[in-house]
Amino acid sequence: MSESKTPKDVIKIVKERNVSFIQFWFTDVLGILKSFSITPSELEEALSEGMGFDGSSVEGFARIEESDMIAKPDPATFQFLPWRPKDRPVARMFCDILEPDGTPYVGDPRYVFKRILAKVAEQGYTYYLGPELEYFYFENNETPKIIDKGGYFDAPPLDTAGHLRRDTIFALQEMGIQVEYSHHEVAPSQHEIDLRYDEGLRMADTALTMRITVKEIARQNGVYATFMPKPLFGENGSGMHTHQSLFKGDANAFYDASDQYHLSAMAKSYIAGIMAHAREMALVTNQWVNSYKRLVPGYEAPVYVAWARRNRSTMVRVPMYKPGKEKATRIEFRSPDPACNPYLAFAVMLAAGMKGVEENYQLPEPIEEDIYEMDEIARERAGITSLPGSLYEALQEMEKSELMRETLGDHIFNKLIANKKIEWDRYRTHVSEFEISNYLPIL
C-alpha cells in the first residue's frame, strides 16, 4: 500500500495537483457505497471537524428525528480516482461516521470493524487479510448475457476480457493497491482478481475500492460488472475466499514448525471458532437471498462446515502452496461472497476466530475426502454440519446469536435483521418465472 497521509499532506497535495473535487466514501449497513463530494475550499474544515449530512436516508443509519450525522474523512485513505480526468483530478477518502458530539456512531460498519481490531491490537496482534473477489462481466445490468465463453485459467481467444482485468489492475495500482494475480474463473464471463494481503482495515477499504474500480472500468468499456453471488443458473457462483492470519510483531501467530500441519494451537482454536460460529454469521458473510443459490453442492462452493489442507470441498482450508513457510501460513475461509459488507464480514470472522482462541475451542480432525461424495450417514459420523440453506435459515441462526449481537452492536444487529426479514418476505411472496413456466400449463 502507499504511504499514509496526514491532513497537512492531503491539503498540500490537493492544492499542488489542482484537485477539483474530493469524494467522501462510506457504506450503509448492507455495504452499499455512499458518496458525496466537496470542493477544495471546504477541505481544511472537513478534515478537522467533518461534514454534516442527513443520516435518516441511509439504510440502517438513524431515524428521521435523530438524523444529523458527521462524516469525518480518514486522511490515510486519500487517493486519486484513476478513471477521472487527469487535468482536473478527483480524489477520495473513506470516512468514519460520528454523532454530532464527535463520538463514533454505532451504526457505522467501519467503526464496528475498527472496534474489534482495537480489541485484538490490545492483545498485541495484527489481523491480515487477503480476499479473492470473483465477479462476472455481462453486456448490461438488465439481463445476464455473457461476453465470453472462457473457463478456468483460459487464455485468449476464449478469454476475451483480459484487457478489462488489465485496465482494472492498472487503476488499482495507481491507487497504491497491490494485486497478486488475475485470471478467468470457471464459469463463462467470470473473473477473479486477487489482492495482496494487507492489514485488516486497509483491506476492508481496499475490497470496497476494488468493487467500484471493477465496475467503473467495465462501464467505460461498455459492459457491466457484477458481484452478485449467483447470476447464472447451472454455473459456478462468485465467492470471496478470505485468507487470514494474525501476527504478533513479525511473527506469524498461526505458525508452529513442530506441528504436523504447521499450525499453532492458536490457529487451530481460531479455525474451530470460525467453524463453530459459521452458521450464525452467515447472514453477514452471505447476506442476500441470492447468496444461497451459490451455496449448493456441485458448484465448488463450500456447503459443509469442515476443514482440511488441500480439500476444496471444505469450508475452511489451510493452503499448502508453500508448506512450512512461516509468513505464508494462513487459513482460507471459503464460504463468504463478494456482495457482503467487508467491514461487517471481516469483523464477524475475526470475532468468531478469537472466540475460539479465548475459550480454547478444540479443532476436529481434517476431512481430506470429497464431502460432496459422502452420504448423510457418513457426514453425521464425521460430525460434519452444513451452512444455512436459505436466507431464512441464516436469519434464524443469527437472531439467537449472542456473539453476533456483541460483535455488531445492538443497532446494526437489529437493523440488519429487520432489513433481511423484509427481503425474505418479498422473495417468499414473489411469483417467479419458474412457477409460471412449470405450473401454469398444468394447473
Outline where the language-model segments fall.
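Glycine-rich, acidic/polar active-site loops that bind/position phosphate-bearing ligands
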Residues: S2-L443
